[in-house]
C-alpha cells in the first residue's frame, strides 16, 4: 500500500516538474524586450542620470541593424531624443509629455540588451549637431519671418487700395 502511495506521489511530482519545465521557457521568452522597448528603458536611464531640468523623449529611432536570437548579446542602437516640457523630478512618463518648443535635441548611440531581467545599456548622448537639424531650425525661422513679412505687404496693399477710392466730402 505504501508503495502505491509513493508511486502516486512520485507521479504527481513528475507532473509538476514537467509542467514547470514547459512553463519556464515561456517565462523567459516573455522577459525579452523588443528593440524599441529596450531603447525606451535606456531613455528612462538617461533621464534618471541627466542633470538637465526636463525629461527627454524619443524623437527618432534608427532601425535596428542586427537582431540575433540571444537577448543577452548587446545590440547597437542609435536614436534621437528631444527635451520635453515635463520636469525631470516628475513621476510622469516621458511619452506623455509634449516636446518643448526649441527644446534641446540629443543624438544617442550605444548598445542595449533585450533581456528584461538582466537588461543593460551603454548609451552616450551628445547635442545633435547634424546639419539637417540646423537646417530645420533655419527653415522654420525663415518661414515664420516670411509669413510676418507677407502679412505686412498685404496690409500695405489694402491701405493703398483704400486710399485710391474717391472720398466723399462731408
UniProtKB/Swiss-Prot annotation:
<keyword id="KW-0732">Signal</keyword>
<comment type="similarity">
    <text>Belongs to the cathelicidin family.</text>
</comment>
<dbReference type="GO" id="GO:0031982">
    <property type="term" value="C:vesicle"/>
</dbReference>
<dbReference type="GO" id="GO:0061844">
    <property type="term" value="P:antimicrobial humoral immune response mediated by antimicrobial peptide"/>
</dbReference>
<keyword id="KW-0399">Innate immunity</keyword>
<dbReference type="GO" id="GO:0001530">
    <property type="term" value="F:lipopolysaccharide binding"/>
</dbReference>
<dbReference type="InterPro" id="IPR018216">
    <property type="entry name" value="Cathelicidin_CS"/>
</dbReference>
<keyword id="KW-0964">Secreted</keyword>
<keyword id="KW-0929">Antimicrobial</keyword>
<dbReference type="GO" id="GO:0050829">
    <property type="term" value="P:defense response to Gram-negative bacterium"/>
</dbReference>
<dbReference type="GO" id="GO:0005615">
    <property type="term" value="C:extracellular space"/>
</dbReference>
<keyword id="KW-0165">Cleavage on pair of basic residues</keyword>
<comment type="function">
    <text>Antimicrobial protein that is an integral component of the innate immune system. Binds to bacterial lipopolysaccharides (LPS). Acts via neutrophil N-formyl peptide receptors to enhance the release of CXCL2. Postsecretory processing generates multiple cathelicidin antimicrobial peptides with various lengths which act as a topical antimicrobial defense in sweat on skin. The unprocessed precursor form, cathelicidin antimicrobial peptide, inhibits the growth of Gram-negative E.coli and E.aerogenes with efficiencies comparable to that of the mature peptide LL-37 (in vitro).</text>
</comment>
<keyword id="KW-0044">Antibiotic</keyword>
<dbReference type="GO" id="GO:0045087">
    <property type="term" value="P:innate immune response"/>
</dbReference>
<feature type="region of interest" description="Active core">
    <location>
        <begin position="150"/>
        <end position="162"/>
    </location>
</feature>
<dbReference type="InterPro" id="IPR001894">
    <property type="entry name" value="Cathelicidin-like"/>
</dbReference>
<dbReference type="InterPro" id="IPR046350">
    <property type="entry name" value="Cystatin_sf"/>
</dbReference>
<protein>
    <recommendedName>
        <fullName>Cathelicidin antimicrobial peptide</fullName>
    </recommendedName>
</protein>
<feature type="signal peptide">
    <location>
        <begin position="1"/>
        <end position="30"/>
    </location>
</feature>
<feature type="disulfide bond">
    <location>
        <begin position="108"/>
        <end position="125"/>
    </location>
</feature>
<feature type="propeptide" description="Cathelin-like domain (CLD)">
    <location>
        <begin position="31"/>
        <end position="131"/>
    </location>
</feature>
<keyword id="KW-0391">Immunity</keyword>
<dbReference type="Pfam" id="PF12153">
    <property type="entry name" value="CAP18_C"/>
</dbReference>
<dbReference type="Pfam" id="PF00666">
    <property type="entry name" value="Cathelicidins"/>
</dbReference>
<dbReference type="GO" id="GO:0050830">
    <property type="term" value="P:defense response to Gram-positive bacterium"/>
</dbReference>
<dbReference type="GO" id="GO:0042119">
    <property type="term" value="P:neutrophil activation"/>
</dbReference>
<keyword id="KW-1015">Disulfide bond</keyword>
<dbReference type="InterPro" id="IPR022746">
    <property type="entry name" value="Cathlecidin_C"/>
</dbReference>
<feature type="disulfide bond">
    <location>
        <begin position="86"/>
        <end position="97"/>
    </location>
</feature>
